[in-house]
């Protein structure tokens, strides 16, 4: 029998629902009685912002689907119809396309925060793995959605990415044909990608988001000091250094969400193309199998991996390095041998390595947008080496680093050293 939890509602209808559905316990477990550290900083805002963008993407995607036609003959024209003839269609389309870029901005910052404060370490390894699975699904969702406008750049970029599967030994060619449903990117491919984009992957993303949050609330949130607040409790059994997520953290989050939405809508209204980074110029032309864009590049949020692909002379090895560049994130909890979580108390080795990694990732992102010639290839190879060195050398430099003493309780204001 379920535990008898006193209802928090006074409204008769809500109390009636609460007697038949665990609404009160859900709110208590995940909001009013879920305790998080008092010293959260701005880095802890990006997880909430990712949820905000996810809602925006689902709502705008729903309305776009009402008027979009997933066929090679009608796809491009249906997008133009949405932009020109559907009431506020231009706004919905720009909210969706801008939202895709903002989604990856907040996701990358959310991942970087975990790397700053050791949020992937015990007991949060599963949270990290679920988060990475969610990241993989988001990458797939973005890729499948990228082809749907049937612009010339999305057509040829899709051709390049799908062909990478052909380098898988033994069954690569068969897998590539299965993904396309044809011998080349065609109407069949577009229909398949549409099905993945609007049904399969959104369901997978929702499931992983729920699992990610449940796992987080089961073990508790990390904090900038990397200490466990459950260790010190008051007489009521509540963490001394924790506050209820609602209303304390939700109130602060609302301020951050407001600022974020101002920036987001400024981009939507004044720079939806963002100089060709959010919406490429070549995608304003319909797909043409006989006209290759001068410079084929994927969306900017994939360009770090694209630069790694092009940095390796052998195409098959380049594809392997691309896959490894993404997969290595999953193994961070086991590659990092240091007992200390937060960068505040870690040695100079990890601080230097993480800084070099961040520089490498940003540099590769820039290089992936440039032509694969001369100095750009040489720099891409250098930063590919530093990118992989962060992961592959981690078991060694994290063992050698000299750490500071970690406080028993959270620190509310960082003291100057």
Residue ranges and their predicted role:
Residues 2-102, 106-417:
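Membrane-embedded and interfacial regions of multi-pass energy-transducing membrane proteins
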């Amino acid at each position: 029998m379920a535990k008898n939890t006193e209802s928090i509602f006074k409204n008769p209808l809500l109390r009636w629902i609460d007697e038949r559905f665990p609404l009160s316990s859900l709110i208590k477990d995940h909001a009013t009685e879920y305790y998080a550290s008092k010293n959260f900083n701005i880095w802890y805002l990006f997880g909430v912002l990712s949820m905000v963008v996810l809602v925006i993407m689902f709502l705008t995607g729903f309305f776009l689907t009402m008027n979009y036609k997933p066929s090679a003959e009608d796809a491009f024209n249906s997008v133009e119809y949405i932009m020109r003839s559907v009431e506020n269609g231009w706004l919905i389309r720009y909210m969706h396309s801008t939202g895709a870029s903002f989604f990856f901005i907040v996701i990358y910052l959310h991942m970087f925060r975990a790397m700053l404060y050791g949020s992937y370490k015990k007991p949060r390894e599963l949270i990290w793995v679920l988060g990475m699975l969610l990241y993989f699904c988001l990458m797939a969702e973005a890729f499948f959605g990228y082809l749907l406008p049937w612009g010339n750049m999305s057509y040829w970029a899709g051709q390049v990415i799908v062909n990478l599967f052909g380098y898988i030994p033994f069954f690569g060619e068969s897998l590539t044909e299965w993904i396309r449903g044809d011998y080349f990117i065609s109407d069949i491919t577009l229909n398949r990608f549409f099905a993945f984009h609007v049904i399969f992957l959104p369901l997978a993303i929702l499931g992983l988001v729920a699992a990610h949050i449940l796992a987080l609330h089961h073990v508790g949130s990390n904090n900038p000091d990397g200490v466990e607040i459950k260790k010190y409790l008051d007489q009521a059994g509540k963490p001394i250094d924790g506050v209820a997520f609602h209303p304390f953290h939700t109130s602060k989050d609302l301020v951050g969400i407001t600022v974020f939405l101002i920036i987001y809508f400024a981009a939507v209204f004044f720079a939806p193309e963002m100089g060709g980074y959010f919406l490429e110029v070549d995608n304003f032309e319909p797909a043409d199998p006989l006209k290759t864009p001068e410079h084929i590049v994927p969306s900017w949020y994939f360009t770090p991996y694209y630069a790694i692909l092009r940095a390796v002379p052998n195409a098959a090895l380049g594809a392997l390095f691309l896959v490894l560049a993404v997969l290595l994130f999953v193994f961070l909890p086991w590659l990092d041998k240091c007992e200390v979580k937060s960068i505040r108390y870690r040695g100079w080795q990890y601080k230097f390595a993480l800084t070099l990694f961040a520089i490498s990732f940003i540099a590769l992102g820039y290089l992936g947008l440039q032509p694969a010639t001369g100095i750009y290839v040489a720099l891409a190879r250098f930063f590919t080496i530093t990118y992989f060195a962060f992961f592959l050398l981690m078991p060694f430099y994290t063992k050698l680093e000299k750490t500071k003493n970690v406080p028993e309780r959270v620190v509310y204001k960082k003291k100057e050293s």
